[in-house]
Amino acid sequence: MSEENKSVSTPCPPDKIIFDAERGEYICSETGEVLEDKIIDQGPEWRAFTPEEKEKRSRVGGPLNNTIHDRGLSTLIDWKDKDAMGRTLDPKRRLEALRWRKWQIRARIQSSIDRNLAQAMNELERIGNLLNLPKSVKDEAALIYRKAVEKGLVRGRSIESVVAAAIYAACRRMKLARTLDEIAQYTKANRKEVARCYRLLLRELDVSVPVSDPKDYVTRIANLLGLSGAVMKTAAEIIDKAKGSGLTAGKDPAGLAAAAIYIASLLHDERRTQKEIAQVAGVTEVTVRNRYKELTQELKISIPTQ
């Protein structure tokens, strides 16, 4: 039993009224009188200590999923072709289930917006899996795309380019190191078109993205190249010095990170070629070479000869 004040017409003092959750009754603790019964408990039948637990244990189904065109609110007919007992359906019932699925898909995707979102969310999931993006980034990208649809920004533009732009914006917002070239290579749209859509989203949706930090790219590039933690640390220190000297302003963060890693790999005798680093970083060899020259000259870094 837990104490809970209840405003009822009774001589029982309010602070003496308790609620019996098991029986659904309000009782006066002084007299034992049942003041009100048959109370329906509209709360959950479980306990949760965090918002995440509360969402997972909701009795009304799974949590909303922004990466599904209808946010996962509709039901789905399973594709396993098995009945409720787990037995495989016979050929006749299998054909019936196939027809039901077709009609269900038609019912779920009726309007042009539904069709647009369904195609876009499939594209988002495909690119997200290829880039190994976490769910939080895909959710953020889905929200950005939905806002673009609501404002009519997709009309007259390819779904692929807007989805790619939304993914890039989400990566920037979540401080996940992914370049525009890296995302664009997995779409039919070219980089120029994706960049144009990205600028449109920032302008029309008022999406705020933090300034990219070259250090955000260091860990990922170094891991892909199999470099040590010492190389990562030195590369980060080089970037910090470059910031202090004003060398990072207006420069591509991925290119700066690539050059810093190249310098650090030489200093620690874990040599990688400029071509190898450029490919992993998603920049050109020329960019790595130019940033390398700037950093070594301006910061007076001496590279040991082989």
Curated annotation (Swiss-Prot):
Which Pfam families does the record match to this protein?
TFIIB, Zn_Ribbon_TF
This chain's function reads:
Stabilizes TBP binding to an archaeal box-A promoter. Also responsible for recruiting RNA polymerase II to the pre-initiation complex (DNA-TBP-TFIIB).
Gene3D superfamilies, A to Z: 1.10.472.170, Cyclin-like (1.10.472.10)
Keyword Zinc-finger in annotation: no
What does the record give under GO molecular function?
DNA-binding transcription factor activity; TBP-class protein binding
User: Keywords of this protein's UniProt record, alphabetized?
Assistant: Repeat, Transcription, Transcription regulation
Q: Which domain of life is it from?
A: Archaea
PROSITE patterns attached here? TFIIB
- PANTHER family in alphabetical order: TRANSCRIPTION INITIATION FACTOR IIB, TRANSCRIPTION INITIATION FACTOR IIB-RELATED
GO cellular component terms, A-Z? transcription preinitiation complex
Extract one GO BP annotation from the record. transcription preinitiation complex assembly
Spans of the sequence repeats?
Answer: 122-205, 216-297
Organism name: Saccharolobus shibatae (strain ATCC 51178 / DSM 5389 / JCM 8931 / NBRC 15437 / B12)
The Swiss-Prot or TrEMBL record describes its family as follows: Belongs to the TFIIB family.
**Name of the protein this chain belongs to:** Transcription initiation factor IIB
